[in-house]
């Protein structure tokens, strides 16, 4: 069996570092290992319309922005096929058929769907398309016979429901659908990076994001205003690591080499944490260190993005060719014939 990756993002805005550590960075690593036969990266514009149906221009205009972020972060069109979901009508067709395998009550019990409904204030009037989001994801995964799906922790219930649909389809008809393996981020901090304000989720709508395209000045401003430990008032006070956003970000981005370059008084993050917990280490010092780490990580991405943005014709040509490749060459709906 071919080893195939499918993953993607909804084009509702530029990508932020939550997307980056949650999935995008891992995609680039997997792409460059050469261990997979095919890697498909989907810009899920059709799914984005399920809660942006009254603002299609927002979705349309952000397709190019997401593609810029992809390539700036290191996704190579020669190694990964980047395509636009809405241009593949077979995915919508398969979604329709899979709807017969899932009850409305099961969709409503999906923890991710429930959380998203609450966040968007859809409780009184849930769009049917939004409720069927997990079914659409299942169609995407199975149409490409994906064996591996890199996701953030918040998407786990979606993938579990996809597996349920695969099992039911295979038991009713024939075992032709591939059940995908779930690939989570490398550590707990990367699974669900909190917003800069300490809230549980980094979200465009909450204004608590650091974007891949942010300027150095914007990144620094956001880091310096980040939530830390409200009880750590004096430098001498013992501090708490748990729930401290600065340390969560360091867990996601920091390596021992960063200490050699920017904070040589410490060998690694464990030593820094122990000093903070004892007291005698100020929030400003760790924020300055985080700023150095983040600037180093994001600068090459930002510079590549700025260069790519000078030639949007090339960016859209990549999307056109990727979508054509999927449409005419690789996409095969499930069959045993």
What are these regions (language model features)?
Residues 26-29, 33, 165-172, 332:
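Active-site catalytic microenvironments for nucleophilic, acid-base chemistry
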Residues 16, 271-281, 299-327:
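Short His/Asp/Glu-rich catalytic/ion-coordination signatures at enzyme active sites or charged loops
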Residues 2-139, 295-298, 302, 306:
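N-terminal Rossmann-like or analogous alpha/beta NTP/dinucleotide-binding catalytic cores
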Residues 16, 70, 154, 249, ...:
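Residue-level preference for non-acidic, small/hydrophobic
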Residues 61-65, 69, 161-164, 289-296, ...:
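A non-catalytic, amphipathic alpha-helix used as a structural packing/dimerization or gating element
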Residues 329-335:
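Conserved small/polar residues in nucleotide/adenosyl-binding loops
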Residues 114-295:
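Active-site cores that bind ATP or allylic diphosphates and position pyrophosphate for catalysis
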């Amino acid at each position: 069996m071919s080893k195939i990756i499918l993953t993607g993002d909804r084009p509702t805005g530029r990508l932020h570092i939550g997307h980056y550590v949650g999935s995008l960075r891992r995609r680039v690593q997997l792409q460059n290992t050469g261990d997979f036969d095919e890697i498909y990266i989907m810009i899920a514009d059709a799914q984005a319309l399920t809660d942006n149906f009254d603002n299609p221009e927002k979705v349309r205009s952000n397709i190019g922005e997401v593609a810029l972020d992809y390539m700036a972060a290191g996704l190579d069109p020669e190694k990964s096929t980047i395509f636009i979901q809405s241009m593949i009508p077979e995915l919508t067709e398969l979604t329709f058929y899979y709807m017969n395998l899932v009850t409305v009550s099961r969709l409503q019990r999906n923890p991710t769907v429930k959380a998203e409904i609450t966040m968007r204030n859809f409780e009184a009037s849930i769009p049917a398309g939004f409720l069927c989001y997990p079914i659409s994801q299942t169609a995407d995964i199975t149409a490409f016979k994906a064996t591996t799906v890199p996701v953030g922790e918040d998407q786990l219930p979606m993938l579990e429901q996809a597996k349920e649909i695969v099992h039911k389809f295979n038991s009713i008809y024939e075992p032709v659908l591939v059940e995908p393996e779930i690939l989570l981020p490398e550590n707990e901090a990367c699974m669900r990076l909190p917003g800069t304000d300490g809230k549980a989720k980094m979200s465009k709508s909450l204004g608590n994001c650091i974007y891949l395209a942010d300027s150095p000045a914007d990144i620094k401003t956001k880091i310096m205003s980040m939530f830390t430990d409200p009880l750590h008032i004096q430098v001498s006070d013992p501090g708490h690591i748990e729930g401290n956003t600065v340390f969560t970000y360091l867990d996601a981005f920091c390596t021992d080499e960063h200490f050699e370059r920017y904070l040589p008084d410490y060998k690694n993050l464990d030593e820094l944490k122990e000093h903070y917990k004892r007291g005698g280490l100020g929030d400003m010092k760790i924020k300055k260190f985080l700023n150095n780490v983040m600037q180093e990580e994001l600068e090459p991405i930002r510079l590549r993005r700025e260069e790519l943005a000078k030639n949007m014709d090339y960016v859209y040509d990549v999307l056109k060719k990727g979508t054509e490749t999927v449409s005419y060459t690789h996409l095969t709906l499930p069959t045993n014939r």
